[in-house]
Amino acid sequence: MEPVIVEGDLIDEDVEVIVNAWNRNVIPWWLLLPQGVSGAIKRRGGLAPFRELGRKGPIPLGGAVLTGPGRLPFRAIIHVAGINLLWRSSERSVRDSVRNAMAIARAKGYQSIAFPLIGAGTGSGKPERVLQWMLDELRSIAFDGKVRIVRFRGRG
């Protein structure tokens, strides 16, 4: 599989499921001020995905969990724990996040998925390095559907 790299807003992608780069889910979601993709999900999709996520409990580093999309036009959201408790990403957390998100997508039969650059925002990972880790991992996974990696482009 060869992922397509695009520039834009993940929330505007025409896919069945999006990936949200989240945290370990040990701090109650309502105590956090979501940024990046999480902030966009909250603003445009409402609180339902985060309430559902909060009921899932802690997520292992690199783990992934599925929630509904709230008011967003997707079938679901896959939240990945791409950053550790110190809010930092690593090669392992990024690769594990990609692999576990794809495992959920395949198990659920989704044919299209869009990823942000996991760990490149809040996680302080260098975007080019994170992109390479993600590409390497995605290329090693058998998937017949469409995979997009979205580099954020702000509005305005």
Place the predicted regions along the sequence by residue.
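Solvent-exposed alpha-helices and their adjacent loops that cap or buttress functional pockets
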Residues: D9-D12, P69-L72, R139-A142
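Conserved, mostly hydrophobic/aromatic
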Residues: V19, I78, F115
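Conserved acidic residues
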Residues: E16, R75, Q111
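Phosphate/ribose-phosphate-bearing ligand recognition and processing surfaces
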Residues: I83-G156
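Short gly/ser/thr-rich secondary-structure transition/capping motifs
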Residues: M1-G8, I59-G63
